[in-house]
Amino acid sequence: MLERLALTLAHQVKALNAEETESVEVLTFGFTIILHYLFTLLLVLAVGLLHGEIWLFLQIALSFTFMRVLTGGAHLDHSIGCTLLSVLFITAISWVPFANNYAWILYGISGGLLIWKYAPYYEAHQVVHTEHWERRKKRIAYILIVLFIILAMLMSTQGLVLGVLLQGVLLTPIGLKVTRQLNRFILKGGETNEENS
C-alpha cells in the first residue's frame, strides 16, 4: 500500500524534472520512508487518543524513532507490517507501570545499557556505516538517553524513557528473534490471503 503510493509519487516527481532528480528507485525508497513515518505517527496518535494517552504515545514514538535511527534494529519486509508492529510495540510498552520517580531512571538506564551492549544492529541488506560514524551515533544516543531521563524527572515525560527501553529490548537477541518471527507470520498471512483470493 505505502510502497505503491511511494512509487506513484516517485514517478510524478521524476516526470516534473527527469534530468535533475534521482532515479525512480531512490525516490521510491525515500518516499516509502517518509510515508511510513507519517502513517505510523497518525496511527500512534489515533491509538493514543483511543487510550486517552496521546501525549504519552507521542513521547514513546518520538524517543523510539530517534533511538532506532541512531542504533539500528531488525526490519520487516513490508513497511505496512513495520508500521503496525511499531504501533503494537508502542502500545504494549505504554502499559509499563511507574511505581515512583525512580522507575523512570531505572527504565532509562536499563534501555541505555541494552543499547550499549547490543547496538548497532543491521540487517544483512542494510548499509553499514564506518566504525567512526557508528561510535558518533552511539554517543548521540547516550546523550539523548541522559536528556530523556532528566526530562522525565523534571517534566513527567515518562514516554521518552519508555521509547529508550523499547528500543533496547528490541535490540536484544530475544527482541530480534520476536521481530523476525512476527515478520514471517505477517508474510505467511499475506501468502495465505493471496491464495484465497
Curated annotation (Swiss-Prot):
It is found in: Cell membrane. It is a multi-pass membrane protein. GO terms for biological process: proteolysis; quorum sensing. The keyword Hydrolase applies. Keywords: Cell membrane, Hydrolase, Membrane, Protease, Quorum sensing, Transmembrane, Transmembrane helix. The keyword rRNA-binding does not apply. GO terms for cellular component: plasma membrane. Pfam families: AgrB. It is an enzyme of class 3 (hydrolase). Coiled coil: none annotated. GO terms for molecular function: peptidase activity. The chain crosses the membrane at residues 29-49, 79-99, 102-122, 143-163. Its main location: membrane. Its EC number is 3.4.-.-. InterPro entries: AgrB. Belongs to the AgrB family. May be involved in the proteolytic processing of a quorum sensing system signal molecule precursor. This is Putative AgrB-like protein. It comes from Halalkalibacterium halodurans (strain ATCC BAA-125 / DSM 18197 / FERM 7344 / JCM 9153 / C-125). The lineage of its organism: Bacteria, Bacillati, Bacillota, Bacilli, Bacillales.
